[in-house]
Amino acid sequence: MRHFGHISPTAREGLFFREPCAFTADSPARMLSVALGATLYSPATRPALADDVLKQAGRGVVSMVLCLEDSIDDAEVTDAEANLIRQFAALAARDAASGSQGAASAPAAQDRADTPGEAHGTPGEAGVDVPLLFIRVREPAQITDLVRRLGDSVRMLSGFVLPKFTEERGRHFLEALTEAEAACGRRLFAMPVLESPELLHLETRGEILRGIARSVDKYRDRVLALRLGVTDFCSAYGLRRAPDMTAYDVHIVASVIADVVNVLGRADGTGFTITGPVWEYFRRQERMFKPQLRRSPFLEGRAEELRTALIEHDLDGLLREIELDRANGLLGKTCIHPSHVAPVHALSVVSHEEFTDAEDILSRGRGGGGVLRSAYTNKMNEVKPHRAWAERTLQRAEVFGVAREDVGFVDLLAAGLTN
């Protein structure tokens, strides 16, 4: 699979100076942690879940979480588990019929995706790559039980999302993951969710963070990314951010995000990928504040119509939050609505200017440091201080691609939405 693989090769060529690379569920963890992008959540109770997964894959989704936790009623868990087993079996059967190799998406499947007109087939047809699939569980015992019940269709599974993660609670989840992995003979990743009230409370935050750091470091090779449960953070204080506001406007939430990145997101080799919080809103009738999207990027062609649609669906706030996520050290985003996926991916593409700066900073012969003027003649690049930024930028460029010099996020967003 690849980002923007759902659009035609001709369209990709027109958008990208360097196209997104292909990857599979068996790619290195470092690559997959960056490639997660917009991770779309879906309740595990949906009766046509296999069809839903393939439909979203055909729209550009590359990672999904099938939820057995907060998105379903307590009384639905048993039926939801049974539904998951059926839906994974259906996905595995379709995958076998297409000649692919499950979540690994064999090279042959990627070759099909590069054939004009076959970037993705109709849901259920050959040629549709299954996204990276994760199951969000409630209790550690569900991990081993589900892996056992999945049988051969476990090959469609990339891992588990671990809720309300702390050192004590997380240890049991990670031990269960290790046991399940040994039983099925397949690599399984963990994505812990940091959302407990103890993490939010100032008097316990430091020790909770240090405990989480100890826990995930012990299982570093299996922790793909850390996710933030901002809705739970707000709940602890009876708060809910409005669609005109980002998570960073809620200071108590912004402070815990900063501390999580401080301890767990360092660029010195000890850190992890930390994903952005969920955006809760779709569309509403009335707004209090002025729209946050400037007109200037939307002046050509039908772009003004796109701007209007984004504002009507409350996605201008989402776009701002995505930019603030990256400015604060987060990458990717939890999504609960398909309309949120394209904006996340469009803003994850590396601009030609960013790419040029990063390559200049990391170019051979620059190891001794120094200062150089950007090729765009609009900024100073310091080799040593900007090195970690440049390395992360090139990692993002590998999986999301580099836009052509005259291509902006509006072009990328429009392409993602119309294909």
Residue ranges and their predicted role:
Residues 1-419:
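Expand to "…catalyze enediolate/carbanion chemistry for C-C bond making/breaking, isomerization
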